[in-house]
Structures are given as C-alpha cells and as structure tokens.
C-alpha cells in the first residue's frame, strides 16, 4: 500500500497517465501489444473491453477470439489509482473502431462521473457491464483483490437501468450477448419462432425461451396453411415450436421454404433453430458438403431477413467435432450457442437493451 501511494503521488505530480497498478496493462492487437503470446494479433476487432481483473481481461481476449469475435482494444486496469474505468470508457465510446463495449468492474472511484460517462456511452453504442462482487461475500473478495468498495447491488442495478447498460453475471453471458449484438439484426419484438429437430427438444427449447420472458406465439393462419401443404406430421409438428427433422430430411430447399414462410409471418419477430449434433454429426463427417450447405442456407436467410436469427448446436457426444466446426459458423457470422438457455438469456438481454 505504501509503495502504491508513492507511485500514485509520483504519477500525479508528473501528470503521468498510469495504468494500474495490479494489472496486465493494455492489449492493442492491431499494433501487436499483447497480454501474452497466445493473444491473437488482428486488425478487425470491434469489441472494446475493460477489466479490473487481469485474468478476466486475458480470458476475454482469448475466448472472444475463439468465438469469432476480436478485440479492438482492451485495458486491464487493476487498482486504477490514476486512470479509472471512466477514463477508459470515455476513450472507447469515442473510438470509431469499437462497435461494442464490454467491461468487468468491481468498483468505481467516482460514482457520479462513472454514471454520467456510462450514460453517454450507452447513447452511442451498446455497453455490457459484468459486475464483480454482487454478493456480500463477493464484495469482501473485491476489497482484498483490488481494494474496491462495492456499492449496494440494488443501487448498482438501478444505475445500470438508468444508463441503459446491458448487465451480465459472468464471462459466458457477456460473450453470448456480444454474439448477438455483432451478428444479428436488432430485435423489434419478443415473438419467437422456434425450430427443433425432435419432439422432446421442441418442448425444451420452448421452456427455455418462455422462462426467459419471451413469447412463443401462434403463427398466423396463412403460415399454418402454407406449412400444411408439405409438412410431415408423422412424428413431427408445425405448431410453434416446429418439430421438423422428418420434414427436412437433409433438404436445404425444404429448409429454405420453411424459413421463408416463417419470416413472412407477422407474429414472428425472431427465429431460433436447433441443429442436432447427435443426429447430424455422422452425416456431416461423412459428407462435409452437407454441413457447408447447411451453413450457407442459414447465412443466406440471415442476410435477406430483417429479423434476428440464432442457432443452437448442442455438442451432445460430439464435443470435439463440434468444436472443430464452430469456426465455419463464426466465419459466416452466425451466432452459435451450445444450449437453449444461453441463447434465450442472451436474446432477452439484447431485446431489453433495444427497448430501453
């Protein structure tokens, strides 16, 4: 503490913008400044990330890249004795290369300035705030970690709502929200069309999205009429949700037909589709072109539609294989999730942001 005090006084006397201490510093991939040798060097980053934790800063830079999203700039600022989170946030909100801002923060030095800066930043671009120390025990941990005195959670939550920030609880939720912000159209409503491969999964995906506060409405009469012309109801259903594996049977023309019909439905604001590794992996492995055609069809639909579209691909027993094909989805800018619950939670957060 004594050394930190001396360092702070020296920096302020010299008008020196000190990062940290107790941090990893700056990650600037475009110019090759990295936290470690594993961090990618890229010039197409769109995410600005701020972290009071060095580990979370490193983890975010690595895992976001593994999910097809690159960082424009990242600052690990630790104890923030000279430059605080508000200084970095102010920079990122004015940075043309940064489209989305995320942060992990345990506490702030100047609450009023942070509130005003965050509110202005949220007017310019989406800001996702992952707060550390949300519980009494967690707040004690932040004090020993970065010396941050956490504000009461109710006060913090109220400030986030007033500013229009998107709040998350962990790294996965933060990344999931960013997938949608960077790779889908903005939602205009909460009416979901849900497309599953089997009956059981159609129930599970419906429960997941309904529990997240999203609607699974009846389709318009015209939609039922059009689907009824060709849909196989033996072991399937074209209610909402759809149980459609027996109808599609690997035909991209049929999938395209279904997607076009649902896209035209006025009751549908967005679509979420399950791809089943449990059933499809064998075919994709044997005929890789079938996977490529599936991704191409989804990408084409996503491009022509004005409605958000997301894909859920549970690894099942094919975790290693699914991990190997994820870059194909990322390259096509398809937001890919490994569970119904994560997809639903992310969509609900982005929808709430759009309505704030």
Describe every region a protein language model picked out.
Residues 1-356:
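Catalytic-core regions of core metabolic enzymes
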């Amino acid at each position: 503490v004594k050394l930190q005090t001396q360092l702070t006084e020296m920096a302020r006397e010299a008008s020196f913008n000190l990062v940290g201490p107790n941090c990893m510093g700056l990650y600037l991939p475009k110019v090759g400044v990295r936290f470690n040798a594993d961090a990618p060097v890229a010039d197409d980053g769109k995410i600005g990330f701020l972290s009071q934790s060095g580990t979370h800063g490193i983890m975010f830079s690595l895992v976001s890249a593994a999910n097809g999203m690159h960082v424009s700039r990242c600052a690990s600022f630790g104890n923030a004795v000279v430059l605080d989170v508000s200084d970095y946030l102010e920079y990122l909100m004015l940075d043309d290369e940064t489209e989305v801002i995320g942060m992990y923060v345990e506490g702030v030095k100047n609450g009023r300035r942070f509130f005003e800066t965050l509110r202005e930043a949220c007017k310019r671009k989406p800001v996702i705030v992952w707060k550390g120390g949300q519980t009494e025990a967690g707040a004690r941990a932040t004090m020993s970690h970065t010396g941050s005195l956490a504000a009461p959670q109710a006060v913090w939550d109220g400030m986030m709502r007033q500013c229009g920030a998107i709040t998350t609880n962990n790294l996965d939720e933060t990344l999931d929200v960013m997938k949608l912000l960077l790779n889908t159209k903005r939602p205009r409503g909460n009416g979901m069309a849900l497309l599953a491969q089997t009956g059981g999964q159609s129930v599970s995906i419906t429960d997941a999205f309904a529990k997240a506060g999203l609607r699974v409405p009846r389709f318009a009469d015209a939609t039922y009429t059009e689907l009824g012309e060709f849909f196989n109801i033996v072991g399937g259903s074209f209610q909402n949700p759809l149980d459609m594996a027996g109808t599609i049977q690997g035909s991209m023309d049929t999938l395209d037909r279904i997607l076009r019909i649902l896209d035209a439905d006025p009751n549908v604001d967005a679509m979420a589709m399950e791809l089943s590794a449990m059933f499809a992996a064998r075919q994709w492995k044997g005929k890789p072109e079938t996977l490529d055609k599936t991704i191409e069809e989804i990408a084409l639909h996503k491009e022509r539609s004005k409605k958000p579209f997301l894909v859920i691909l549970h690894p099942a027993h094919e975790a290693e294989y699914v991990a190997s094909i994820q870059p194909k989805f990322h390259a096509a800018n398809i937001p890919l999730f490994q569970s119904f619950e994560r997809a639903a939670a992310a969509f609900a957060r982005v929808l709430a942001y759009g309505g704030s």
